[in-house]
Amino acid sequence: MATKPIAKVRKSVPKKVESQVGYFGSYGGRFVPETLMAALQELEAAYEAAKRDKKFKEEIESLLREYAGRPTPLFLAKNLTQKLGGAKIYLKREDLLHTGAHKINNCIGQGLLARRMGKHRIIAETGAGQHGVASATVAALFGMECVVYMGSEDVRRQELNVFRMKLLGAEVVSVNSGSRTLKDAINEAMRDWVTNVRTTHYLLGSVLGAHPYPMMVRDFHRVISREAKAQIMKAEGKLPTAIIACVGGGSNAIGAFYEFIGDKKVQLIGVEAGGRGKALGEHAARFRGGAPGVLQGTYSYVLQDEHGQIAGTHSVSAGLDYPAIGPEHAALAEAGRAEYVAASDAEALAACSMLAKTEGIIPALESSHAVAECVRRAPQMRKSDVVIVNISGRGDKDIGILREQLRF
């Protein structure tokens, strides 16, 4: 009974939401069953208190530095720049972090917060598996129980990460309902949380869900743009012309964008999954085929049919095929501050191959969508322009898919 509002798309939203806590312009909010309201309020209060605690901040910074491997390099991709013949291209190397992706930034922060709250059990959802691996890693580090929910289609696509999670001590629950992907994994994780809220922290992996998650996850990832801004100023003596990042839920992108939002001359470009076609169900481009609605706790752009039912999605990348986008991205798009485009499966695969062959870097298929937009855009730019592409993760997990799709 209590689970229906979690997955339902609603097209209405309260008036004057701009003045309410937890909104980004008209987007965001807290649309959950009453059984979860107290848990979210507890989490919000704990996070606000933690932000004021100098020791909490110092412990996060220490673990990011000593355990995760921050700061990550900002690498000048000379070969790719020369090949494309336009803007100078830098790569923000989040793929070099412990566990292989940006996800560890958020997991360390939320893991410390869960411990501070006295929770001894962590649950998480995962699509590509990187958030599941990072959650299992942090749970092992802090001595916590960990259960990861993953759609059975993603389990099939990401066998390596499933084994990594189990090796780290996590229980992986394969979800066979619905489309058997990330949306369905989130549904099951939320059902678990409703049942076990006193002992369990839901370690949500993106800037999705009900307040305070979009704000909190963004805060844990803003280190990406904080570093990148200092690094590009040191390397070039000026701000970049553009920042490009892939957008599933949108955590790596908002992390890469955040410190540049106030710099109006810096273009912020998010790249969604264009999939294999423009018809509903053939892609996961929310701004191309979606409309505002409420899904799994937040009001944002959602892929939905004419009846308000959640539409199917497709992407070669398991981490980009979620039907909704983080509310802060919706607000940035509506304000005209960020631009959102789409790269197809074929374009992402070609970009992955190009980066591997020019720079010796195999990006995750998620990140390859951002590389694809760089490949399209950079040749049209001036040689004096500077582009930063956020390489959110490495492609080890995708080798099976790459071998199957590229066939060489």
Curated annotation (Swiss-Prot):
Transmembrane segments: none annotated. Gene3D superfamilies: 3.40.50.1100. The modification N6-(pyridoxal phosphate)lysine is found at residue 103. Its EC number is 4.2.1.20. One of its GO terms (cellular component) is cytoplasm. Its cofactor is pyridoxal 5'-phosphate. The keyword Kinase does not apply. Pathway: Amino-acid biosynthesis; L-tryptophan biosynthesis; L-tryptophan from chorismate: step 5/5. InterPro entries: Trp_synth_b_CS, Trp_synth_beta, Trp_synth_beta/beta-like, TrpB-like_PALP, TrpB-like_PALP_sf. Keywords: Amino-acid biosynthesis, Aromatic amino acid biosynthesis, Lyase, Pyridoxal phosphate, Tryptophan biosynthesis. It comes from the Bacteria. GO terms for molecular function: tryptophan synthase activity. It catalyses: (1S,2R)-1-C-(indol-3-yl)glycerol 3-phosphate + L-serine = D-glyceraldehyde 3-phosphate + L-tryptophan + H2O. Pfam families: PALP. The beta subunit is responsible for the synthesis of L-tryptophan from indole and L-serine. HAMAP family: Trp_synth_beta. NCBIfam families: trpB. Belongs to the TrpB family. Tetramer of two alpha and two beta chains. This is Tryptophan synthase beta chain. It comes from Koribacter versatilis (strain Ellin345). The lineage of its organism: Bacteria, Pseudomonadati, Acidobacteriota, Terriglobia, Terriglobales. The gene is trpB.
